[in-house]
């Protein structure tokens, strides 16, 4: 165990292969229901199929491992208005996004409040939170939010 003020190098420093990185800790969540109300008309839509989605969340600082959220959710079809819809996941992540709201908020905060460049913010997320976000993605999030 390191003493206070003692330098300890990053455990992932020098790793060049993705297979050698620490395996992520998995959190399992489910949004799989038989029926859901249709977002358009409110009629009960029946489950058509179950689908899987993986989101990357802030990692575990103590163990030094990344964290992934595996979500099993249901896709439904409304018999009344004939539309297809998914179980809502707006509280976890934006549609078609691979990262949770916590990751997006932290990345934008690093750039806007702390004034870090995009590349440094990306490195900070990996070093301190064990989540890899390409710096171009961080730039897209900041520009979409109107931060700079």
Residue ranges and their predicted role:
Residues 1-90:
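Short, conserved DNA-binding cores of transcription-related domains
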């Amino acid at each position: 165990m390191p003493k206070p003020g003692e330098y300890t190098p990053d455990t992932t420093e020098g790793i060049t292969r993705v297979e050698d990185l620490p395996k992520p800790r998995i959190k399992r969540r489910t949004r799989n229901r038989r029926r859901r109300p249709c977002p358009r008309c409110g009629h009960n839509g029946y489950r058509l199929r179950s689908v899987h989605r993986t989101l990357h969340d802030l990692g575990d600082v103590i163990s030094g491992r990344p964290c992934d959220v595996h979500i099993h959710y249901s896709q439904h079809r409304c018999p009344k208005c004939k539309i297809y819809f998914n179980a809502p996941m707006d509280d976890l992540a934006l549609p078609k996004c691979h990262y949770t709201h916590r990751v997006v908020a932290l990345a934008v905060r690093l750039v806007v409040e702390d004034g870090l460049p995009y590349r440094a913010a990306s490195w900070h997320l990996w070093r301190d939170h064990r989540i890899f976000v390409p710096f171009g993605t961080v730039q897209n999030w900041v520009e979409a939010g109107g931060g700079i």
